[in-house]
């Protein structure tokens, strides 16, 4: 039998997950009665499975999120756009969290097990494919402050708790002894993931459609984190996220449509093995 554990925060919509697993035509289980999907609602900055129990681990994009936001970012919200003291704080937190993540997963893995981690990255020079998209969002947020749609205090609290790493940062724990917590690197690659919306734009030339696709991507992935800084959200106002997201999306579409740009991103894949 194969037991598959899906791990996410307790607030995750596990009902939707199991609906997909039961009805999606591309579901991995299909009709195999020997595959048993399960779910665990817990942060991966804790132990999530018993020691020496995992044969194969897979983490897609989640490891980019930090255990906590270590600093505000003056003038921006995107960690790769930070400088000085703020940048140093994110680098320290990124290093600490990566080692904590590896240590916890190592304890859960059986000897001979493999762990595959896929996550967004940046180049060694600090270049992120999302920089222009983030700058457009940052400018739209500044407009919202000027309009009174959000307060300056709310804007200052807006920080993405993510930290895209350089390849060298992923490999740093393994450089001294060749292993870390009995984990060794079998493969580590960084490559460019093309912007599919840009590919569509090259064919149809529709600037507004391009801008809408890019803004909707930003809305789905990043806006909930930014909206958590809103006083109304903290007070439990269920409409606050929608009204904030609608206004920010409109501002981004307006800017992106006048300055079409590709948001090709860097993706890293690291494959780790636990020694016997």
List each language-model region with its residue ranges.
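Substrate-binding/catalytic lobe of Class I Rossmann-like enzymes that use SAM or dcSAM, i.e.
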Residues: 111-236
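A Trp-anchored, charged/polar loop motif used as the substrate-binding/catalytic surface
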Residues: 40-43, 86, 91-104, 165-172
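Conserved beta-strand elements of beta-rich interaction domains across eukaryotes
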Residues: 9-12, 64, 122-124, 190, ...
């Amino acid at each position: 039998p194969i037991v598959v554990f899906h791990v996410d925060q307790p607030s995750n919509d596990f009902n939707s997950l199991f609906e997909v697993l039961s009805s999606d035509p591309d579901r991995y289980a299909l009709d195999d009665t020997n595959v048993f999907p399960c779910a665990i609602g817990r942060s991966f900055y804790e132990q999530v499975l018993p020691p020496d129990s995992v044969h194969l681990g897979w983490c897609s994009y989640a490891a980019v999120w930090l255990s906590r936001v270590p600093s505000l970012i003056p003038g921006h919200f995107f960690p790769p756009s930070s400088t000085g003291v703020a940048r140093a704080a994110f680098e320290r937190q990124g290093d600490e969290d990566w080692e904590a993540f590896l240590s916890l997963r190592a304890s859960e893995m059986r000897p001979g097990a493999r762990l595959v981690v896929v996550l967004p990255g940046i180049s060694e020079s600090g270049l992120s494919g999302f920089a222009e998209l983030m700058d457009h969002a940052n400018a739209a947020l500044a407009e919202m402050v000027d309009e009174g749609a959000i307060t300056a205090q709310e804007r200052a609290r807006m920080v993405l708790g993510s930290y895209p790493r350089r390849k060298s940062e992923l490999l740093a724990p393994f450089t001294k002894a060749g292993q870390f917590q009995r984990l060794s690197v079998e493969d580590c690659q960084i490559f460019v993931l093309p912007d599919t919306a840009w590919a569509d734009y090259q064919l149809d030339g529709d600037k507004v459609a391009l801008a809408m696709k890019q803004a909707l991507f930003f809305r789905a992935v990043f806006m909930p984190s930014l909206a958590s800084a809103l006083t109304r959200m903290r007070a439990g106002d269920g409409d606050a996220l929608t009204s904030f997201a609608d206004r920010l999306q409109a501002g981004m579409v307006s800017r992106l449509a006048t300055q079409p740009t590709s948001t090709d991103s860097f993706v890293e894949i690291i494959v780790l093995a636990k020694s016997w």
